[in-house]
């Protein structure tokens, strides 16, 4: 698990749009948020374009029902074009996305935060290059590192700031990734429960899940309560 430091990493976070959003899981409100970071030096192991040192970050929130009276279900989902849109079976991303939307709909309330961190933060083209390396026998972590990136370049400050902007201070977080729990807690948002987002494994991504568990610390057993 990575260590997160408290602090406001953005000069501003603003709501840019809001609209009705019917889906096959039910009606949501869809919100668009834009975060502008304070000046900082980009991490060379996570930057595909050093000239773009401080680009605005965009994120979408799907909100269903009353999320203010009790700690809501929250899912932080990182964009995965290949899985979420094309149904790739190299990963479990689409299955996790659909599980989150279905769970929120069954609960009648919750928040899905969809952020643009394709390929665990390295971007779409490097992600496809990593696929090619995986075809040659490297695993998902080794492929990222072979390309000069960290195993996981994602940071989760923007979801935390959006939750605070929405007045959310406690959540039931749907994740298998301890880093997401740590990021929210370090931002002052209490994770009262970790809800599992484990999906049924398939042969095509069984190794991928094993690597996430063994090398990245992801949790593959059932959910638990968190009071940290």
Task: Name these PLM-found stretches.
Residues 1-228:
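Catalytic domains of riboflavin
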């Amino acid at each position: 698990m990575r260590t997160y430091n408290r602090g406001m990493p953005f000069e501003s976070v603003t709501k840019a749009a809001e609209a009705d959003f019917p889906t096959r899981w039910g009606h949501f409100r869809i919100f668009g948020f834009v975060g502008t970071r304070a000046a900082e030096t980009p991490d060379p192991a996570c930057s595909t374009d050093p000239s773009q040192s401080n680009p605005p970050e965009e994120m979408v929130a799907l909100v269903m029902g009353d999320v203010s009276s009790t700690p809501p279900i929250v899912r932080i989902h990182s964009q995965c074009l290949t899985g979420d849109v094309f149904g790739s079976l190299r990963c479990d991303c689409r299955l996790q996305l659909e599980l989150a939307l279905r769970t929120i709909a069954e609960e009648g309330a919750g928040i899905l935060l969809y952020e643009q961190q394709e390929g665990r933060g390295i971007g779409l083209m490097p992600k496809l290059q990593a696929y090619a390396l995986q075809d040659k026998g490297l695993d998902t972590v080794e492929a990222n590192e072979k390309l000069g990136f960290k195993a996981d370049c994602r940071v989760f400050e923007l979801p935390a700031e959006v939750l605070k902007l929405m007045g959310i201070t406690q959540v039931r977080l749907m994740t298998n990734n301890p880093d997401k729990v740590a990021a929210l807690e370090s931002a002052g948002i209490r994770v009262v429960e970790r809800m599992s987002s484990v999906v049924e494994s398939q042969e095509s991504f069984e190794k991928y899940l094993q690597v996430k568990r063994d090398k990245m610390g992801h949790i593959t057993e059932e959910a638990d309560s968190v009071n940290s």
